[in-house]
Amino acid sequence: MIKKLLKNRKGIVGIEAAIVLIAFVVIAAALSYVVINMGFFTTQKTKEAMQSGLDESLSALQLDGVVTGKTNDQNRIEWIVFPVKLSAGRASIDLKNGTMVTSIYLPEATLLNLYQGVYNETMYGTDPIDLQKVLDNMTSIFQGKENEDMAMGIIYNDDGDTVLESTEKAFLIFHLDDNPPGGIRHTMVDYDEVKVEVKGAKGAALTIVRMAPGGMLPNSYIDLG
């Protein structure tokens, strides 16, 4: 009888040990799950931080063609036109006034934040072909300010808004004052170098450097490369 009781007792102890072991296994599995999830979460956050840093280190815009200058009757470049498009991997960028900063660095002047927004195609016609017409219209838009430094954007193949998208192309047009207060010209003469910086809401600034050639003729379009 005593032997039978001892045998039953051993059986109960074995079951209890098994239950405790199972409990340990379940707890260990739960802890492992938590640790693995934390690892995945940390990895995801690290990836997002790296992607965000990469996005900020790259410009949202890139140059997309030839930079063109337009001289006035004094043989000086008064207008500069930069063709741009979205950089690879970018979905869109808003070009409206207040979201862009454009600065221009000249031999005798540094002009900060000249940007005035997007050219109104509703008023002046969609995707105008003749650049001179665009320049004339810009002069009309800023009537009374023809002698001021300014910059505007115009979007082609657009859907009527101020957002530049992947299927669209924009031109950033700068006007330089030939006779500003103080008498220091902002226009470019032969062999002057100009640097332009364009900064959107996200990403690094797009920087473009060009030099005016020698022997520029009056009222002519100049290929700046």
Where are these regions (language model features)?
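N-terminal single-pass transmembrane signal-anchor helix
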Residues: 9-39
